[in-house]
Regions:
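Chalcogenol-based redox active-site neighborhoods
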Residues: 2, 16-165
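Short, basic, low-complexity termini and linkers enriched in Ser/Thr/Gly/Pro
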Residues: 1-15
């Protein structure tokens, strides 16, 4: 079970794990953001990376067993779809006091190690996670060409304990 990194009083059950989360309604406009990229050090804004086809925003972290379980498939899918013009960006909003392995330096090390083909951004204030109603990792948001939410949820049915890759 992944730890929650946001709090909201309006909760609904999230099917990916035992963590409850709110759900950004389908059709919602993507919340704008400008966050530091832990790999290259520059600031990334949503409007600068958004694709005219689709944009995938992922809330992940280094320590979550669910993220670790899907990392290989995530990299494979991202490489495949980036080649087709789909934009990908990952964001970590974890509290580094409680999870020091999720700090910016460790994020960069992890991104290089697993060969993330997308920016890995650090949301220190957790304001971006709150704007997206993200509550656990991994959490995936797919926005259409107009940055309207088309999908929110899990990558697939796999999890560390079910034997599905």
């Amino acid at each position: 079970m992944c730890k929650s990194y946001t709090h909201n009083s309006q909760l609904t059950t999230h099917t990916m794990s035992f963590t409850e989360s709110t759900m950004l309604p389908l059709g919602s406009e993507a919340p704008p953001f400008a966050l530091p990229d832990t790999i290259f050090g520059n600031t990334i804004r949503l409007q600068d990376i958004a694709s005219d086809k689709a944009t995938v925003v992922m809330f992940i972290c280094n320590h979550c067993p669910y993220v670790l379980h899907v990392n290989e498939e995530l990299v494979r899918l991202a490489n495949d779809y980036i080649a087709r013009g789909i934009a990908f960006v990952a964001i970590s909003s974890n509290d580094v006091v409680n999870y020091p392995q999720d700090g910016p330096g460790k994020m960069k090390e992890h991104a290089v190690k697993v060969k993330y083909p997308f920016p890995y951004l650090y949301d220190e204030s957790q304001n971006v996670a709150k704007a997206f109603d993200a509550a656990c990792t991994p959490d995936f948001y797919i926005f259409d060409k107009d940055l309207k939410l088309a999908y929110r949820g899990r990558l697939d049915d796999s999890k560390p304990s079910n034997g599905i890759p």
